[in-house]
Amino acid sequence: MLQRAYRFLLSLWRRAASNPEALQRRIDAQISRAVTNVGSGNLARARLELSKALEEAPRHPGALKVQTCVLLELGALEEASQAVARLQSLTPGQPEVAVLAALVEQRSQTPAPDWRGALIQAWNRVGRPDLVEAEPFPSPLPDTTAFVERVWERTQSPEVRFTAMLADGASDAQRQWLAAHVAGLEDAALLLAAYEYFLPRSGEDALADVRRQARETLRRKIEPLIPRMHESEGPLLLLLGESAKEASLTQENIHALERIAGLPRYRRTSLAQAYADAKQRLELTAVTAPPLRVLQAAVASMVTDAVVILWTRVEATKEHLSAEDRVRLGRTVFTLGARIAEGATLSDRMLGLRHMELGAEWMADVEKLAQVKRELEHGRAVAEASSALQVDSWPLPSLHRAWLQASLDDEWNSLSILVAP
């Protein structure tokens, strides 16, 4: 019996050896399993998968990159140095390998810089390469069951189910269910997010009536809250959400915008609070929610559509105003933009600055326009630098936690360090 099993396994090995594509697929799967285990914190299992892959393909760059990251995560710095040195000899000139090697060196210092600081220093040291076009780190295995499905199986709560939809996406059937149950939403931030979620979408006529009915229900719940709001996001969303995006503003709209611009803040909820709220809701289901899923839900719950609509409608109004009214509207748009730009996220900062730029142009305020353009240039540099690092792709949970926390504390300031002089 044992001999028969041994012969069977040997035949499988020979078949794989004679089929390089099958062998490559198996090795790639082992590496993806290793990355999946890294993400779940099972580093011992990840090392086992990597040892199997490297036994068959000792020169596999992806396996060596993940191995270096696992050793870094474990604090095995000498082994990590050896692994990355081997990787460098096999892949000379690869920018992501250069950054990884510099990261190992940074973390080997005494005292070692924190994960976030170490990566930034490593990236700066090797010339700040753009890793968007670099050879990516291996990816984890795809989920066999969608996150939203796992959450929906555990709860009937509209708020929890909607949070899962924001974190992962949804089917038409799930959207229809939520539309029929939006009356069960109570949290003000989720009410606004749901209203935005059900705004008309181009090319989706099959759900047009469903979206409209959901918005009608949500508007009835939101409108009584508006007088008590000290933030402009809710009133702005209700004012512009239903309108044709390319239509010019009416005088009534302009008066309403002036009132909205007089409110002291744009956001009612910070990214950190939105993250904490989403995490708390998802934890009720006992489904493990990866931090990036929670972050996606938090970001998606912070409404932005009204700001984009405002831009297009203001632009469409330009030719219908007198010079005096144009200056007046420009002042309103500049003020609203400034409120939005006070947010701590990169998105809010850039959206706000774009509206401030438009407002300054309409006011013909040369000094303000020049200042805003400088800030926009800085913001674009920050966005490009953030993208260049490709932090989400690094299989380093400690780095992800540190980066996430800095973003929740103050994303704009934490990313501005990337382009600090």
Model regions: which residues?
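Short coil turns that delineate tetratricopeptide repeat
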Residues: 24, 58, 92, 183-186, ...
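Register position in tetratricopeptide repeats
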Residues: 39-40, 73-74, 106-110
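Canonical positions in the second alpha-helix
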Residues: 53, 86-87, 181, 225, ...
